[in-house]
Amino acid sequence: MTSYDLIVVGSGFFGLTVAERAASQLDKKVLIVERRNHLGGNAYSEAEPTTGIEVHKYGAHLFHTSNKRVWDYCNKFTDFTDYQHRVFAMHDGTAYQFPMGLGLINQFFGRYYSPDEARQLIKDQAGEFSPEEAQNLEEKAISLIGRPLYEAFIRDYTAKQWQTDPKELPAANITRLPVRYTFNNRYFNDTYEGLPVDGYAAWLENMADHDNIEVRLDTDWFEVREELRAESPDAPVVYTGPLDRYFDFAEGELGWRTLDFDLEVLNTGDFQGTPVMNYNDADVDYTRIHEFRHFHPERKDKYPKDKTVIMKEYSRFADKGDEPYYPINTPEDRTKLEAYRKLAAQESKDNKVLFGGRLGTYQYLDMHMAIASALSMFDNKLAPFWNEGKALEQERGH
């Protein structure tokens, strides 16, 4: 029987970061329990077997951060390419530069607008509603960018994402719709950006590659919990699975959106000429198409010249058993979340369980945010627990 100093449930970036820090910095023996048959949560990638093209199994994952500590930490486990993400939006048979900027505005309205002219144009078109008086998402969006751009690029895309007419969605769902008054069409504005040179799977495996870390794949925490906690009664648990599932849905199910993916290998060297194409119109039921060869142009000599891999992405509400991706966060969800946070705080006190990550805190986290949050938990909760005997407490709001 092996006794562990820490048990981590889930091997996404949050769980792996906590495990790696405990193992490498404090020489703790760590067990990672993972329900899936691979490490890395939704960031996992693998080679498509017939082409060798690296596929992001759960949708495109683009690494970007302005947090130097997070960037330096990640670089311990992988080198990054100089990839910069750019997106195009398909509307009415034309591909537009995205996000909204001078490129899109000039293309859509059919003439050159200077930055000042474009600002005035959007201001005039947005005057139909005031943001403060908007009654629903549609009115709020029009108050920010005007009706023409809203109807072309936001209305149908939002309806597909949420399976709901934007007139039925709350205005509070959007606080801003940024418009750039430059021709810069870089999707992210962060200081650091890139993709792992050898792929996500290699990066994730490097994080877990430590003598003090044991990983058990294909293992459901709820089936082994009692046995593992009995074997290591003093070990804290960091749980990164769904918060409501941990408490057996005692306060009701939290609402999530999920994604479905349709992977195809095509007999062409290039399908769409760009990594991601959004499909903004209602007559196409997917929200976007990923073409993975374009994420790694430096691999062009390794990838086949006559085949490509695309993945269509569809969005819908998650049912029980679906993979949860994005918190819906209705007022009802927030009420349930408050109740679950109280249960989580009590569980931390009574049973040394901390909750983290996207699923464990019911919040959308980019990869760099999950890593930063995990580093904070290690620094502020776990290290003081081991080094100073401080009690474990769940952070407020997490």
For each predicted feature, which ranges?
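Beta1/beta-strand and adjacent pyrophosphate-binding region of the FAD-binding site
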Residues: T2-F14, L31
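Glycine-rich FAD pyrophosphate-binding loop
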Residues: I7, E20-P49
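Short alpha-helical segment within the catalytic ATP-binding CA
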Residues: T17
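Short, well-ordered alpha-helices that flank and scaffold nucleotide-derived cofactor binding pockets
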Residues: E20, S24, D209, S376-D379, ...
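Mid-domain catalytic core of redox enzymes
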Residues: Q25, T219-Q346
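Dinucleotide-binding Rossmann-like beta1-alpha1 core, especially the glycine-rich loop
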Residues: T50-G127
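Active-site/ligand-binding neighborhood in enzyme catalytic cores
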Residues: D92-Q97, L102-P236
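C-terminal catalytic lobe of FAD-dependent flavoproteins
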Residues: E323-H398
